[in-house]
Amino acid sequence: MIQPGRYRHYKGNDYEVMGVARHSETEEEVVVYRALYGDRGLWVRPLAMFLETVLIEGRPCPRFQFVAKYPTPQEK
């Protein structure tokens, strides 16, 4: 399962993952995340695609790599 926090896309940009939601028509699980650069756009991506491995110069690499957990209010 996906935990909220900071993730790095294989192309180098960081994103804040907010959690997993469900598509209203298909009930497919999607990851809800926000870019931590530019206009900080809000995005969704199918969970399976978010978790998949891509080939970069012939080497397997996670599409998104977990970088850091965000502290809960109790941990602050």
Could you describe each region identified by the protein language model?
Residues 1-76:
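Mixed-charge, low-complexity intrinsically disordered regions
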